[in-house]
């Protein structure tokens, strides 16, 4: 039995979330009656309302009076008044991943998983399949700049989705093709141990049907080890590793973009193809690797090399992934979602490779538990920044943990040899600090998953208002 064509109103609790909003938009485009609520009137809520969906700001039992079905994410607490009202009425309550899985049954699906790089890789796969006239449906964990949204309804056979591993629900997704970019210790609050995370990724690959395949980055030692434990499924490896089936070669990161070539060597004897003069208008070797994963999938699905080359060169990027927010006095300000030490290190390395001048990092640590569990890594991931400005921790609903806060991180950076780590008392002071520090040609990179994105977009105007 498939998802019925006709359902009563489908109510999304937390419809403004990046994952929920994408599913809601696709279901609306399929002709379902979609409504939803969110705690705040954010950009996603406004976008969905403009598309004709009924939205509520705030959670209230009255919001589900007309609903026939309720969709929730794991972020919604059991005492949410709308969830309680739905259960009192015995309405079906569906988890976000379960609803995404239902949508995926309509199509052949590419699912992108990994601790880092999922959103950019999902966007790149969608872009390359689009260039090959495959017209994919897309549900992403970030706003794709070319679409102006994180979701797109296509008429083709394929669907491209970001597979969120944070709560383990990615194991519900019926993927035909899977990408694994990397596997690092993250979301330990859910999994309990790194071994449990690695086991979840193994099961994710094992779930692929016999006619599908997995694309896996063997530059990452944990992923390479996982490849050795996968049996009876087709694996295509990628990376700079000389043993990769799809090998990234001659990466040049100068000028704020990535130039490279890729060699494809199938396990079939004698098959070899090279794609040269590839340009991605994003800096960073991590982004060149993401592009290589997308290229591997596109090539396997029949997209021509010239179409791949043109699509990569025209890639418009993803919101909050090394996004330029403006300039001041010759210095460029960027906004980036990076909030894990591996992500921060990769972004700052990309910044360092893209400018011959200084790099100033502004970081808002996200969650006390993450800072605690990865503290040593946080203290050593800022080496490519000349100056690190540390804001107070964005709690995301958590209680403070003694010894793991802004001042602890500043002290940890200094004790491990960083020459210029300093604390930010209040966001209002940031413009003054940057005005004193930044010189023409410098990059100012704002990092974090909290409210720092608002600071990054406000900073150019605030600096201009101060004069030069």
From Swiss-Prot:
One of its GO terms (molecular function) is UDP-N-acetylmuramate-L-alanine ligase activity. It is an enzyme of class 6 (ligase). It catalyses: UDP-N-acetyl-alpha-D-muramate + L-alanine + ATP = UDP-N-acetyl-alpha-D-muramoyl-L-alanine + ADP + phosphate + H(+). Its EC number is 6.3.2.8. Signal peptide: none annotated. Keywords: ATP-binding, Cell cycle, Cell division, Cell shape, Cell wall biogenesis/degradation, Cytoplasm, Ligase, Nucleotide-binding, Peptidoglycan synthesis. SUPFAM superfamilies: MurCD N-terminal domain (SSF51984), MurD-like peptide ligases, catalytic domain (SSF53623), MurD-like peptide ligases, peptide-binding domain (SSF53244). It comes from the Bacteria. InterPro entries: Mur-like_cat_sf, Mur_ligase_C, Mur_ligase_C_dom_sf, Mur_ligase_cen, Mur_ligase_N, MurCDEF_pg_biosynth, UDP-N-AcMur_Ala_ligase_MurC. The keyword Cell cycle applies. It is found in: Cytoplasm. NCBIfam families: murC (TIGR01082). This is UDP-N-acetylmuramate--L-alanine ligase. It comes from Methylobacterium radiotolerans (strain ATCC 27329 / DSM 1819 / JCM 2831 / NBRC 15690 / NCIMB 10815 / 0-1). The gene is murC.
